[in-house]
Amino acid sequence: MSSGGLLLLLGLLTLWEVLTPVSSKDRPRFCELPADPGPCNGLFQAFYYNPVQRKCLKFRYGGCKGNPNTFKTIEECKRTCAA
């Protein structure tokens, strides 16, 4: 296979990995945690996975501590937790 063909294959595999949803058995356990703004007083938009609604939702993050179910972008939340 030519180097161009290998590069195309690598690109397609990477795209497939990014776009493939996480199955519930592969979902990290921290995705079940509730949204936690943390103790700080910042007003940052963040996203968390809501297991009841089975989707990523917005919430206000204080900027420190909180829990691992806190994402800067909805894409990162979906990639990590959404089924």
UniProtKB/Swiss-Prot annotation:
Gene Ontology CC: extracellular space
Its Gene Ontology molecular function terms? serine-type endopeptidase inhibitor activity; toxin activity
- Any Pfam family the entry gives: Kunitz_BPTI
The entry's keywords: Disulfide bond, Protease inhibitor, Secreted, Serine protease inhibitor, Signal, Toxin
Tissue specificity field: Expressed by the venom gland.
Q: What domain of life does the UniProt record list for this protein's source?
A: Eukaryota
Q: Which residues form the signal peptide?
A: 1-24
Domain (BPTI/Kunitz inhibitor): give its ranges. Answer: 31-81
Q: List the disulfide bonds.
A: 31-81, 40-64, 56-77
InterPro entries named among the record's database cross-references: Kunitz_BPTI, Kunitz_BPTI_sf, Prtase_inh_Kunz-CS, TFPI/VKTCI-like
Specify whether Glycosyltransferase is a keyword of the entry.
no
Subcellular location field: Secreted
- Please state which protein family the record places this protein in: Belongs to the venom Kunitz-type family.
Its function, per the record, reads:
Specifically inhibits MMP2 activity (EC(50)=100 nM and Ki=60 nM).
Q: What else is known?
A: Negative results: does not inhibit serine proteases (trypsin, chymotrypsin, elastase, kallikrein, plasmin and pepsin), cysteine protease (cathepsin G), and MMP (1, 3, 7, 8, 9, 10, 12, 13, and 14), as well as voltage-gated potassium channels (Shaker, Shal, Shaw, and rKv1.1/KCNA1). Does not inhibit vasopressin V2 receptor (V2R/AVPR2).
Checking PANTHER family in the record gives: BPTI_KUNITZ INHIBITOR DOMAIN-CONTAINING PROTEIN, KUNITZ-TYPE PROTEASE INHIBITOR-RELATED
Tell me what this protein is called. Answer: Kunitz serine protease inhibitor Pr-mulgin 1
